[in-house]
Amino acid sequence: MFDILMYLFENYVHSEIELLVDEDELTKELTRAGFHQADILKALSWLERLADLQESDKPYLCNHAQQSFRIYTKDEMAKLDVESRGFLLFLEQIQVLSVETREMVIDRVMELDEASLILDDLKWVILMVLFNVPGNESAYEQMEDLIFEQPEGRLHS
């Protein structure tokens, strides 16, 4: 399923090509690209729930303190290793993620059918969430820079 999400993001969203709006046509396109029907339906459902998060009239989180600390559940810790959880905290500290967008990312990660997620895959989920939440253009650009920019020169002497 994650491969399909990456395919859609790279080929349609990130490349700014208009996404096919007809789900049947999109399903046929993905089938021609070699993806299985069941995985396609899961990926489209995942994207639909992501869109629902942004379109909801209700705030994603209610009554949260700005200085609160996120405690991960056992299932969340199984899917997000220490490095990934640390990266989420880092993104909050540099204000790429807000408390709300962090929770949206965790929500979308937990809906993936992967047992665990490596950091590079988490970065793509974060990018997908930020792309779909209005008003996060600057955060999206910062996240793009974190993914695509390669450090220049030597890191260590």
UniProtKB/Swiss-Prot annotation:
InterPro entries: Smg. It comes from the Bacteria. NCBIfam families: PRK03430.1. Belongs to the Smg family. This is Protein Smg homolog. It comes from Shewanella denitrificans (strain OS217 / ATCC BAA-1090 / DSM 15013). The gene is smg.
